[in-house]
Structure formats: C-alpha cells, structure tokens
Amino acid sequence: MKILSEQLLLICLMSMFLFVSTGVAHADKSDEINHLLEFIAQSDCIYVRNGKEYSALEARDHIAGKYESVKWRIRTSETFISKIASRSSFSGKQYMIRCKEEEQTTEQWLSRELENYRSRHQ
C-alpha cells in the first residue's frame, strides 16, 4: 500500500510539473512575440513587403494580423519569425527591413532581437 501511495504521489508531482512548465513556456512565447511586435512598431525602419514600402506601425499591424489568424498553430517564437514575420504567405517573398540605409531580411533582424531579448530576460 505504501508503494502504491508513493507511486501516486510521484505521478501527481510529475503531472503538476508538466502543467506548470507548459504554462511557463506559453507565457514566455507570448511575451517574446509581444516584444517582437513592439520592437517592430518602435523601430525607425522601413518595412519592405512584396516590393512596397511600409512604416513600422503598418508592419507591426500587418504581422500582428497574420499572427492573430493562426496563433493557435505557432508553438515557438522562432516559428513566429520564420512563418509569420519574415515572408509573404501569398508570394513567398521574404520581407525586408531597411534601417539607416542598411537592408536585411526581417528574419535576420527579428532573430537577432529575440536573442537579445532572451539574454536580457534569463
């Protein structure tokens, strides 16, 4: 009987750990994605999507709208960057970001910011 109660206690503890760790991972992902969206909005950069230029606020609104429609499928911040924030779902073309005459893909730009964010919030 004692062995059974110890096993039951162990199962309960493991279940609690899984529940808590899943919630923490979800909160971290949400915090990270919200930070990236705010990072886009507050930048002084020009966002180039399918050859047309947009302001930082327009870029954030566009990416946030895409994310809202499929957020239940996005499990990580990296997936958010690669599938939502870095390329057109219609043309497949990469989004570009132009900051102070330097142009790069939004995937590179946001991946770097995600690394910076994580290093500040460990």
Where are these regions (language model features)?
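Bacterial N-terminal signal peptides that target proteins for export
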Residues: 1-12
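Bacterial N-terminal signal peptides
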Residues: 10-20
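Compact alpha-helical subdomains of small soluble proteins
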Residues: 51-122
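N-terminal secretory signal peptides
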Residues: 26-66
